[in-house]
């Protein structure tokens, strides 16, 4: 069994906006031996008291940095830690622009980007960005197909249902051709999509036992697609505040037995009040997990 790669979730909703603290966090994660930094994505937050209520946890009061911009900064102050979106809400963004941003970041980071994508829940963001919330699941497959075309070919002729590229291309192309694309989400159409075209899956389930049915489905769908688990990644998250080392060990062992190739440690929601608290937490976990640079 391969060793599971351990990363951290950047705790941006609790971290503040001090660029020096952000630099210190990224450099600490790298020096402690974590394999990657994962960040969430929301472009805008809505007023929770608006007439049509939201269905998710975040509002305009929760700070989120733009992922590509934040990672460009982190790439400049680190050397080799992987930069992972978990996830970027792809259907609310312009596909060709995402291709350009991701390719540029991959070049500037020397091939360190892993792009996790998903559909999102915040319809307000879609409206504000001029995108259709209702057909986001239909559009995302074409988006992923086009991204890979743009990342691997100097010139692209593409005509789909929602996209057309008339013999044009990106320059520079990314270091990774193509950049790995992982999917979040857990609905059955998502699981089929993951198995059909994803490089990996980022489940929201906290425990491996809760994900068993979904993992079984992905296994069947991989078989149908002529693919194998050997070429597929699995990255759950571990909540730092939900237990101590004995509990951490159980959760990690169960996920690894279920096939997890990666795991991200999330220190948000643990009662920490300062950036230093979050940095101390990832230091503590690195010591427990035996990580080393």
Go through each PLM region and give its residues.
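Active-site-adjacent structural elements that line small-molecule/cofactor binding pockets in enzymes
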Residues: 1-293
């Amino acid at each position: 069994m391969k060793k599971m790669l351990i990363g951290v979730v950047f705790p941006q909703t609790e971290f503040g906006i001090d660029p020096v603290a952000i630099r210190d966090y990224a450099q600490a994660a790298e020096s402690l031996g974590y394999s990657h930094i994962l960040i969430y994505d929301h472009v805008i937050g809505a007023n929770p008291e608006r007439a049509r209520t939201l269905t998710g946890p975040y509002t305009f009061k929760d700070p989120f940095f733009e992922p590509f911009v934040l990672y460009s900064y982190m790439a400049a102050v680190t050397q080799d830690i992987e930069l992972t979106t978990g996830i970027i809400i792809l259907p609310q963004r312009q596909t060709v622009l995402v291709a350009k941003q991701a390719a540029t970041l991959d070049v500037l980071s020397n091939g360190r980007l892993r792009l996790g994508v998903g559909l999102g829940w915040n319809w307000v963001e879609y409206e504000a960005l001029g995108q259709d919330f209702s057909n986001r699941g239909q559009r995302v497959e074409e988006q992923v197909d086009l991204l890979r075309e743009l990342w691997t070919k100097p010139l692209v002729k593409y005509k789909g249902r929602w996209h057309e590229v008339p013999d044009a291309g990106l320059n520079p192309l990314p270091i990774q051709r193509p950049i790995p694309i992982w999917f979040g989400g857990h609905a059955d159409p998502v699981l089929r999509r993951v198995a059909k075209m994803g490089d990996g899956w980022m489940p929201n389930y906290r425990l491996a036992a809760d994900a068993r049915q979904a993992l079984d489905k992905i296994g069947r769908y991989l078989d149908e697609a002529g693919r194998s688990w050997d070429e597929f990644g699995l990255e759950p998250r571990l909540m730092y505040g939900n237990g101590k080392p004995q509990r951490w060990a159980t959760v990690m062992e169960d996920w690894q037995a279920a096939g997890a190739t990666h795991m991200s440690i999330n220190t948000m929601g643990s009662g920490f009040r300062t950036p230093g608290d979050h940095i101390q937490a990832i230091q503590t976990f690195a010591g427990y997990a035996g990580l080393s640079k």
